[in-house]
């Protein structure tokens, strides 16, 4: 069995950061290996197997985190791709980019195939790609240097047709015989495509539906039409309902050559200042700057207010470390360690942040230090510290001694880790 991992499970301060596909042995249900995809692979959403059982296709985002976020042309920040895995060898062969040189195909989501075609939904550009399967595979297998294929924006020339859909935000889809059935997440419209003719008919499932400001904001957050050449949406760096892609990015708002780990948007509007360096005084400013300097798009104030409303509506997912919704016995011990080490002097209040700057840890870039992040839902925002140098929360304490100025036992570190991961 091949299982996608949504995000990279590693430290982020490396030259190669990518999510993996795990191979599971079904007899004992044990993991055989992890197959790491192309550099920058994240948000692994779709997976399918070819009819002959030879190849696995995985649809995902490609984050170009090794360069500053200074432009968007030709997929400078984010591109969309699907990776090819050899089933028998259990090896990654290469990644095929589905964008075009002057037009992105953002929000890649689901993937399906039959002998004749490969079908891919694009939630950010509201369309489906139909790729000539046999011609694509032949060209792929004969490609001279697959290590650089994930930068080739011309690979699918003449092999792919982009079919626009009714509605907004096509995500999951079903291939059923000669029909491809594609609902749109933000419009409640069902698209049915005849795969023999590529003709699309649509049905409104909820014609009386009315959008709230939060609904509109979520739609704008995921819509690549609010971006220069449709290369990305806010979802490109903040997948999984406004959370994080697990990678470091060199934004231009606090200098160049100083990449920092992507932050979750959860509680961003109630824990100012914003960004790891605190360079934005509040989240409202950060939202508008994000459209201007990351999407390269002039967002209207009306739309920006809706995005604010959406982000304010985000709520934490209960931690899987909880037991029946309560702290485990180990986490309760960790709470005592948290208090003993005076972690609450910085991580205080309902959001576990005093919203102040502190000089803590290594390589302090700014004289005033770093903005104190919330610890709520921190279990799902690895890696940790300003540049993602800690792959796990335990490493924050055991390796990097974050805020710990005296010797702490392994038992206490285990308990502290359990507690923080339970918040």
Regions found by a protein language model. Give the residues of each.
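Periplasmic c-type cytochrome electron-transfer domains
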Residues: 3, 8-9, 13, 17, ...
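Charged, compositionally biased non-catalytic regions
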Residues: 20-22
